[in-house]
Amino acid sequence: MSTIYNFKTVTVVPSYKDFIDIVLSKTQRKTPTVVHKGYHISRIRQFYMRKVKFTQKTINEKLTHILTEFPRMDDIHPFYGDLMHVLYDRDHYKVALGQVGAVRHMVDNVGRDYVRLLKYGDSLYRCKQLKRAALGRMATACKKLTSALVYLEKVRQHMSRLPSIDPNARTLLITGFPNVGKSSFMNKVTRADVEVQPYAFTTKSLFVGHTDFKYASWQVIDTPGILDHSLEERNVIEMQAITALAHLRACILFFMDLSTQCGHSIAQQVSLFKSIGPLFTGKPVIVVFNKSDLCTFDDITAEEQSLVMTAIEECGAKWITTSTLTDAGVGDLKTLACETLLAHRSEQKEGSGRFQAIQNRLYCAVPQKRDNVERPAYVPPSVEEIRQRLASGEPVRERRKTERDYEWENGGPGQYQPNERKTWDLENPEWVDDIIPDIMDGHNIYDNVDPDIHERLMELEAEEDARLQELELEASKKRPQYELHDSTVEAVRFIRDKIKVIKMERAMKNPSLRRTRRQSVAIEKFNKRTGSQVDRSATPGCSSETTNSSAKRGRSLSAAQEAVMRDRSSSHMSTKTTRGISSHSATRDRSLSVNRGEGYRDVNEKLRAVKLSKVVARPRNLQAKKGEGDRAIPNLRPKHLFTGKVKSNGRRDRR
């Protein structure tokens, strides 16, 4: 558990009346509220058992939350444990939390007993009375917490105002008689705005400030003044300082007022220093002679000086003189205290077993000389020259001028034009200022700057030729190894077309396959190209006029459109001619015929299967219409969801 506690997060503890109102209102809101005597008895029992169980569970959760959030004195740091004992009385605090735990156990027993009784309720009235008795006994049990809840709320309010003190951090602890300048020093070294008044016990509790030293944060704790009397006679204000002195591993700053304006003599202050001396065991102590602007250590008598120095030497403490009015010695006191505490903490770590275990594993490797040859550090000649000039008093050479220096020597920016060619290293220095044209004799000068440009060009051309040869070789591999004559190609095309026509004629002769318009069009195209006599007019039931009329159209006709055209053409014929044609016309193909492999015994079985498939597909077809074109309006307010106890705000339903 962390040593820094945040008591501000403890939830507010309600009073007894508020507690009961919270529990019962939650039970009313979260459980059903309507029951009728006509319901089955098991439903009525369940209704009231739910009420009792929910109330018992709610009280248990609330009381458990209180017990969990309040700290246990045995589990927290001893400093906070003793501080809470001083402020709130450990026994009273434990009794209050114990009462909360006892009432929680009592409520659980009441709920368990009445749930058992409700299982045997034989009517709505009896179940209701059992529920009423259960809630009443729970409320009566919670009434015993009236004083405990009030006390815990006061403790919570006071705990939320306690300072956040880390018992293990670097700490400077200020102590001494009242009105000796402790709070003034606190305000000087930290930003804590502690009240300072010219009377005693202005500071009535612990105040914490923070300061920085060597890039680390330090706690500075201002304690209330302590009077020189027995421990039993000290009040709560003084006991807070005693608790801090006893438990915090800090550097103790004991302030003394040699001018005795605090109302206590030097002897009394020395007596207090000796009486609380056992609390300084194992801690660095610094005695601060404050208010040096009024009285210094040299201004007091020799007897007082010897008395003070004897007490300091017995304790093994250090001493320093300061003045918070003139800031004399304030910074030195802060530095001395921090350095002393750091040294003390280092000594404690060195004496620990962990430090010894780590120290035994450390090894410091020191290089040894391999021969007698001296190998001094290398110093550049320029640096050695500067050292010699400095030793002899000669002026050191000036540094090399840069272009910026020349710029400011010649008028500043905009007036000086730097010469970028003066650092060029050419074969002939006279070539530096030569004017180089961009184009000469129709050639770009920069194309011939490279002396190897001709060789590079030849290499590039050779690479391009090799690449072209590779591409030609790949293309030659993709070409066919032989080529056909045009007449041979035409003969091959004629043979392929003839094979297609033969396949179409065979398909038309087969009665199981229907002849399509696309096949007839393909035959006509073949007749036009080859001069063959394969014509649709030879087909029974189709006249040459129909063929001619369809040939004039740009689009192919479907079977239905062909039938219409035949009807129109036949309307111009006489009745006898029509009868003659109809008597010799071909028979109509069956629309539903059983083909091999379909698995039907006859046409009737196939018709029955088609009808059943339509029936099965009907629900899916009904759902398929849902979309932008769907105009069906479903029931938007189903009665089973909107009947019952529904308030206007819409937050309650029938349950």
From Swiss-Prot:
Polar residues composition-biased segments? 529-551, 571-585
**What Gene Ontology cellular-component terms does the record carry?**
nucleolus; nucleus
A GO BP term, please? Answer: ribosome biogenesis
- Localization in the cell: Nucleus, Nucleolus
Tell me the ranges covered by the OBG-type G domain, including all copies.
170-342
Any one GO MF term held by the record is: GTP binding
Q: Which UniProt keywords apply?
A: GTP-binding, Nucleotide-binding, Nucleus, Ribosome biogenesis
Basic and acidic residues bias (residue ranges):
395-407
Q: Where is this region: Disordered?
A: 389-420, 526-593
Q: Per UniProt, where does GTP bind?
A: 176-183, 222-226, 290-293
| Domain of life the protein comes from | Eukaryota
Instruction: Kindly report the protein's main subcellular placement as a broad class.
Output: nucleus
The entry assigns this protein to a family as follows: Belongs to the TRAFAC class OBG-HflX-like GTPase superfamily. OBG GTPase family. NOG subfamily.
Subunit (UniProt): Interacts with NOPP44/46.
Stated role: Involved in the biogenesis of the 60S ribosomal subunit.
Official protein name in the record: Nucleolar GTP-binding protein 1
Question: Which source organism does the UniProt entry give?
Answer: Trypanosoma brucei brucei
What is the primary gene name for this protein? NOG1
